[in-house]
């Protein structure tokens, strides 16, 4: 077995394992009494795939639902507008996991909670303004990027895109929201496989060729959770989506969201990521020659 095929198999197995856990272990270790208190005060609630609130009993019975914690006031540096944070996780087979968490707590296996938490893909929603007053809000669905968003890497433009999206939404008269998709690292292949693709890119392949060399899709992101959250917060309103990727618009439309206006979002172009962005342009992203600083 070659190194590439071994990495590819490991990445696929990792994704399947995460998906299994994602579908079965999503909302774990909050103590039942605290959970009830949060539910009573309306800070813990569930929505279905159409963005409608549902009662907790229905959520516990299974199905494609999402549990949400919020709103949580979140002061952000460089932001004068008030921002409210919602933490969001899938909610299938919740009862079994809560029982497991209760058992771990009773047996004082505190270290096991970190293991459970490591498999939870907790997405976030950052809301600027009052959704009840929105008419055509500005929205960014942002895929997690540890290297760009956290480390400030210039191999991509993700960090500047995230920061600028918040600034643009803050300055927009309608306000809006950012949905941060924590399971989308490396366009859905995960951080480990993404690191391998970086090495392949340094050997001459572009970002999509590197994925294919590992036997992985060009883009394996799932936007179904983002669509449900948009249905909840935007509630049937038209909205503007900050993206250069028409496929993202198509994916959301296929999940039942209509009346989306794509808004160009070019920022953070440097010599370090121009080749990467050129590959995106070739793949279908709406980037002009001027956007990439080419003559």
What are these regions (language model features)?
Residues 2, 7-295:
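Catalytic domains of riboflavin
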């Amino acid at each position: 077995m070659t190194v590439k095929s071994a990495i590819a198999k490991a990445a696929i197995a990792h994704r399947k394992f995460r998906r299994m856990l994602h579908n079965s272990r999503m909302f774990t270790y909050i103590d039942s009494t605290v959970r009830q208190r949060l539910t009573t005060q309306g800070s813990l609630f569930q929505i279905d795939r159409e963005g409608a609130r549902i009662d907790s009993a229905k959520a516990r019975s299974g199905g494609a639902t999402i549990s949400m914690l919020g709103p949580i006031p979140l002061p952000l540096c460089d932001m004068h507008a008030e921002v409210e944070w919602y933490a969001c996780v899938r909610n299938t087979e919740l009862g079994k996991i809560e029982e497991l968490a209760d058992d771990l707590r009773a047996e004082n296996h505190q270290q096991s909670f970190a293991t459970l938490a490591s498999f939870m893909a907790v997405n976030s929603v950052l809301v600027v303004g009052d959704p009840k007053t929105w008419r055509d809000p500005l929205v960014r669905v942002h895929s997690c990027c540890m290297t760009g968003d956290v480390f400030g890497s210039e191999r991509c433009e993700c960090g500047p895109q995230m920061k600028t999206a918040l600034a643009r939404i803050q300055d927009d008269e309608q306000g809006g929201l950012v949905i941060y998709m924590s399971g989308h690292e490396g366009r859905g292949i995960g951080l480990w496989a993404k690191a391998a693709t970086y090495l392949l890119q340094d050997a001459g392949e572009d970002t999509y060729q590197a994925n294919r060399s590992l036997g992985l899709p060009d883009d394996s992101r799932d936007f179904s959770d983002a669509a449900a959250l948009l249905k909840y917060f935007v509630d049937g309103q038209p909205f503007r989506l900050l993206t250069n990727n028409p496929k993202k618009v198509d994916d959301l439309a296929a999940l039942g969201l209509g009346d989306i206006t794509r808004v160009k979002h070019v920022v953070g172009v440097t010599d370090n990521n121009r080749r990467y962005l050129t590959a995106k342009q070739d793949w279908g992203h709406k980037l002009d020659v001027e956007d990439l600083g080419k003559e």
